Regions:
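Surface-exposed loop/turn motifs in large extracellular/passenger domains
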Residues: 1-24, 28-49, 53-72, 79-104, ...
Length: 201
């Protein structure tokens, strides 16, 4: 990808367009601590996790802001989190995960891969539009996938036309907009209401 952090970075700002990695984190792979990442993330991709941003096991990003458009990966089309993220703000449009036996988290994958250590995203503020997962057998979370010992404090925004689709009869597709294994709060914010419309499996 474009940036690898194994120490501490205070702030990263800019637009990230068409970056790629053979494994994880098309624009940013974090294995340390980051104050903030800001900018637009357009058409970045990886073969495994986090088309735009990958946050590694137990590592910290205080804030991510910007729009995520057309990013794709093996899981977590835009963001894949295995650590802690304070907040994410921005719209997620047309991000996706496609192909393979399993496909999870068209826009955001929050992975609690440990049963003893929590992985947390404090809040997400933004709209999720036209994100999807499509795979061969087991797919879930067209926009957001929240799994195992992972927590997302709240999501404020609209979910429009996201989907989860598995190929073939008898295969499993869950959560056209959101799949979560934990309790999650959906908030309206200043607009006083939010919409979930056109999402499907």
């Amino acid at each position: 990808g474009a940036v690898y952090n194994g120490g501490r970075i205070e702030n990263v700002a800019g637009n990230f367009i068409g970056n790629q990695s053979g494994q994880d984190g098309g624009t940013f792979y974090n294995a340390g601590t980051v104050g903030s990442i800001g900018g637009n993330f357009l058409g970045n991709h990886v073969s495994r996790y986090g088309g735009a941003v990958y946050n590694d096991d137990r590592d910290q990003i205080d804030n991510i802001s910007g729009n995520f458009v057309g990013n794709y990966a093996g899981s977590g089309g835009a963001i894949f989190n295995r650590g802690n993220i304070g907040g994410i703000s921005g719209d997620f449009i047309g991000n996706y995960v496609s192909g393979g036996t399993f496909a999870y988290g068209g826009a955001v994958y929050n992975d609690g891969n440990s049963q003893t250590v929590s992985r947390v995203i404090d809040h997400i503020r933004g709209d999720f539009i036209g994100n999807y997962v499509a795979g061969g057998y087991n797919v879930a979370g067209g926009a957001v996938f929240n799994y195992n010992n992972a927590f997302i404090g709240s999501i404020t925004g609209n979910f429009l036309n996201n989907y989860s689709r598995a190929a073939g009869a008898g295969n499993v597709a869950l959560g056209g907009a959101v799949y979560t294994a934990k309790k999650m709060t959906f908030a309206a914010g200043e607009q006083k209401t939010y919409f979930m419309s056109g999402n499907y499996t």
